[in-house]
């Protein structure tokens, strides 16, 4: 039986069809918003997975290019691995849903979002979050708290829910808010230096609209939701928990109160060895339970320390940032480098400048086709002192890279101001909390060192949260380190300039944040951000005046757009010859702007520009040109005065004396001065060597 329910969001129809597709899935829905359609399938394994200590939730976001009427590029002509954007959208779906599953739930759960049709006014990723929540709520999987999501824009001082393409072009804020009917669960934001008060208001504005979508989901569940399965929840054996905790609590507490991380970890290893010696034989089949008890005991001690004793593991005040150091220019051959260290977190970012032709080409369902500025993030095993195989970037690396990229994007100069492609690579050298925000700081240093004229320096900070079980008591923490992130309830990342916020990402391990917590986190992040910006400015107060001598050089010339075809030539013959002869890269824009770039060959740039100017320059009657003889006939000589532009010097115009034979005066290949005496209606150019000589003699006499 097919069930249908509709509502209206921001003046557009949102509709769900349940039972129409995916008959063998636990729950399968067709969710539409305008002409955007996403199919969501939710399934779970019948039994918990053994031998794991985490919840195995898998969220997939599958883009189909047919959804926008495109055929994939390349030879294979089908969708390949997920794009970076697909991975980011999958992470955005995962983060608000994961905390709402029952604690101890170990069944495999998979949510597959397939984008089937896209109307660019209605973002499929927002629809997918709502659809994933609704599919889970309608299923028999033990998920009972609906989550809703909206996009919020800010145009001309007005907040807009789910802005259209035209509105997104003018918005200074790109905000996604996910919430239950009671609390905010997740926020993603990019903005053009938005002040804290405005950002808070925008989040609350989105929160209110989320409540309406939650009500829609609740109505759907009441009308056609399945009966929920009774979950089998993992819990450590009570006897094991009692004995291990009794034996080890004081030892673990003593270790957890050691401020130095290395010393603390070393002491914990010793405690774990003692626990193993004491219980390995008695509970040889309960190793996982023992590990769970140790983890829960550590968590209890750290949370009590923060919440009730007003003490942090490293002794800092709750609003104190770890010691900071900044360096630039540490790699001699790169275009710009920044080394940012905050406590035991250290990131080195390297900036590379390229020609505009080095942009990243995007083949996705969005309208955006290329990226001129990009940021990549690497997190090797040595950054946490571990040994594991080095692989390509995972979802976490892609997510952190995009977060730092978004933080700096509003500050990057326009193409006309700075005609270069910019790539930043952040290498995490040491990790003890908030490497993504350290990447923002390292990237700022690298850009300034590279001479990129960014609007203002940016910095990032991660705020944390500890709450009581009943959520009544809470404490916000500035600049969380690894242990506070691991045992805490929130990771609230805020990046921006002294003027305002450019990026936010926060998610939580609990059932959402209170409004006061959101406000306190924003204010605390501002204070910390200004402190860090001061340290950055002490190191390098402004962009370097000159680019690195190893960076490419780009010159811009403007031509009449009607002349572009003359520069390109038939089949690209002309432009390819210029590139081959001068060893440069050339980018031509539709408005007639031409960008000429060369690596360490300034003469090549000058030569290429000279050729292009010659190709596009108009011949002026009465002007004198230095031309080259290309052909001789019995009636005169043809002379090329500009690239591709020839004129005729009649035999009578070659010299003052009578000329019997053209070759007596000029030969093919000779360079001679000629004057343009006439351009006829057909564009034919008449030249005179005699008049050019006379004019030069006249100028000499003066």
Curated annotation (Swiss-Prot):
Query: What lineage is this protein's organism placed in?
Result: Bacteria, Bacillati, Bacillota, Clostridia, Eubacteriales
| Presence of the UniProt keyword Magnesium in the record | yes
- Pfam families, per the entry: KH_1, PNPase, RNase_PH, RNase_PH_C, S1
Name of the protein described by the UniProt record: Polyribonucleotide nucleotidyltransferase
Q: What's its EC? A: 2.7.7.8
Give a GO cellular-component term. Answer: cytosol
Q: Could you tell me which InterPro entries the record lists for this protein?
A: ExoRNase_PH_dom1, ExoRNase_PH_dom2, ExoRNase_PH_dom2_sf, KH_dom, KH_dom_type_1, KH_dom_type_1_sf, NA-bd_OB-fold, PNPase
- Provenance organism: Clostridium botulinum (strain Loch Maree / Type A3)
Per the record, the major location class is: cytoplasm
- Briefly, what is this protein's role? Involved in mRNA degradation. Catalyzes the phosphorolysis of single-stranded polyribonucleotides processively in the 3'- to 5'-direction.
Cite the KH domain residue spans from the record. 552-612
Q: Which residues bind Mg(2+)?
A: 485, 491
- Cofactor(s) demanded: Mg(2+)
- What family is reported? Belongs to the polyribonucleotide nucleotidyltransferase family.
The keyword Cytoplasm appears for this protein: yes
Q: Which domain of life is it from?
A: Bacteria
